[in-house]
Regions:
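Periplasmic-binding protein-like
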Residues: 91-96
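Internal alpha-helical transmembrane segments of multi-pass membrane proteins, especially GPCRs
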Residues: 15-18
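Hydrophobic h-region of N-terminal signal peptides that target proteins for export
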Residues: 22-27
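Exported/periplasmic ABC-transporter solute-binding proteins
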Residues: 4-6, 29-73, 78-87, 98-99, ...
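N-terminal secretory signal peptides
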Residues: 1-9, 21
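A short, gly/pro- and small-residue-rich
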Residues: 108-113
Length: 288
């Protein structure tokens, strides 16, 4: 498996991320490998791991434009959120996944305010050329279709896939066709592009990954089948912020110039028609 041998795990390329199991107990310093000492013009930013590829690019652009230093960590959302909610970790800005987490941080006074950041989406993905002729979600239930799913992966990814199958009424037939149940979506994608399966369900952001984008095709899933809870990302200003003016400047950049970068990485901009619709539909507003 040459493709798999050449791959890197989704965590290896995240700036400042290490084993997430230690996060909740140990706080931010253990997840900040390569952490640079705080500077007066620095801003410490955490995001969930799914945003990391985009935020590395956003931070580079912001630093080049302003000269400010962004101390960035991207890691497992659940561990970071738990660390913050239990007061075992501190950061100045937090890109959180799920509106409920942002609301809980706000209610507890751990964050000062939040704004919509972006939205994710889920798609049906097939190897380039679509050898099995997959057309839609229903085709995953057809006899003989080899379905690869990341149900062993950490939530919200695995839970979202299960939710899509449940809402579409396809859980039983698709599970019967599942030939691979992976714990790592990157490893699963490596197998898919090598022809070890016919189709899978993934987050759209993964279709932009350099290792896959030229080796796959994808198609939309009807939004009515996609659970709403994991789609929302928010940008939170935390109570630990040292320079609120810098935090607001960074937030404004992420929500303006940064939106194009997020879209290139497979996310939905908060300024797009779909983004504006989801903000209203989900009530992504900081209301106290």
């Amino acid at each position: 498996m040459e493709f798999l041998k050449d791959k890197i795990s989704r965590r290896q390329f995240l700036k400042g991320a290490v084993a997430t199991a230690a996060v909740a107990a140990a706080g931010p310093k253990l997840i900040s490998a390569g952490y640079t000492p705080f500077k007066s013009d620095s801003l410490e930013v955490w995001t969930c791991g799914g945003l990391s590829e985009a935020f590395l690019q956003i931070n580079d652009a912001y630093e080049a434009k302003t000269g400010h230093n962004i101390q960035y960590t991207g890691a497992f959302a659940g561990a970071l959120g738990k660390s913050l909610l239990t007061l075992k970790g501190q950061t100045e800005m937090f890109g959180a996944r799920g509106l409920e987490l942002a609301q809980n941080l706000r209610k507890k006074g751990i964050s000062l305010r939040f704004k919509p950041l972006c939205f994710t989406d889920y798609v049906l993905v097939v190897p380039k050329g679509n050898p099995a002729g997959i057309r839609d979600l229903q085709d995953l239930a057809e006899p003989g279709v080899r379905v690869m799913l990341p149900l062993g992966a950490s939530p919200p990814g695995s839970a979202s896939v299960q939710g899509i199958l449940k809402k579409s009424g396809l859980t039983d037939p698709v599970m019967q066709n599942m030939t691979v149940n992976e714990t790592c979506v990157i490893k699963m994608m490596c197998g898919l592009v090598e022809g070890n399966g016919d189709a899978s369900i993934i987050e759209k952001r993964l279709t932009t990954h350099d290792r896959f984008k030229d080796k796959i095709e994808y198609m939309p899933i009807d939004p009515k089948f996609i659970p709403p809870a994991p789609l929302t990302f928010t940008l939170n200003v935390m109570k630990y912020v040292k320079d609120e003016k810098l935090a607001e400047d960074y937030s404004d950049f992420v929500r303006s110039d940064g939106q194009e970068i997020l879209e290139r990485n497979g996310f939905t901009s908060v300024h797009s028609a779909r983004g504006l619709d989801l903000i209203e539909r989900f009530g992504v507003k900081d209301v106290q």
